[in-house]
Regions:
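N-terminal "domain-start" segment that seeds a small globular fold
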Residues: 18-37, 98-100
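Active-site acidic short loop of glycosyltransferases
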Residues: 39-41, 71, 96-97
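Sec-dependent bacterial lipoprotein signal peptides
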Residues: 1-18
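Structural microenvironment flanking redox-active thiols in thiol-disulfide oxidoreductases
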Residues: 56-94, 105-110
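Short active-site neighborhood of thiol/selenol oxidoreductases, capturing the structured segment around
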Residues: 36-56
Length: 153
């Protein structure tokens, strides 16, 4: 009887550990992930909205920056916190090629929703906000900031 209980407890512990490895960060137009997979990487988060003209103008710049910098994870996050069904046609309309977080960055890195958009955050490999930008960015401005940040570590 004792052996049977011990085996059940061990099996339960294994199931708990396996469930802890799940992908708990939901991503549209990319692979779901978890914080352990993101730790140790530079990350860029861009808040945008479809009613924000500077945001729409910035999207091709983000796409180009991401395409040229494979060693940083680039994500967008919709300011209006749209669900996937609502986000899908808008992302297609504006040709957003980078993955979009569905999980709020607040729940991942503690980033509060900014008061206005566009807003861009660089997160260092330790998971800390390295730079907060509250104006439209270009591929060149993002590259310059990213190079400066990498050189500080």
């Amino acid at each position: 009887m004792y052996l049977k209980k011990a085996m059940i407890i061990q099996l339960f512990c294994i199931l708990v550990l396996v469930s802890c490895q799940r992908n708990d960060i939901e991503v549209f137009n990319g692979s779901n992930t978890n914080i352990n997979d993101l730790n140790g990487n530079w990350i860029l988060i861009n808040y945008w909205a479809d009613w924000c003209a500077p945001c729409i103008k910035e999207i091709p710049e983000l796409n180009d920056f991401a395409a040229e910098n494979k060693n940083i994870k680039v994500y967008t996050f919709n300011f209006d916190e749209l669900e996937i069904d609502d986000l899908k046609p808008i992302a297609k309309k504006f040709n957003i090629k980078v993955p979009s977080l569905v999980t709020h960055p607040r729940d991942i890195w503690g980033i509060a929703t900014p008061p206005a958009v566009p807003a861009t955050y660089f997160i260092n490999p330790n998971g800390e906000i390295a730079v907060s930008l509250f104006r439209p960015q270009t591929k060149d401005s993002l590259n310059k900031i990213y190079i400066e940040l990498k050189n500080t570590i």
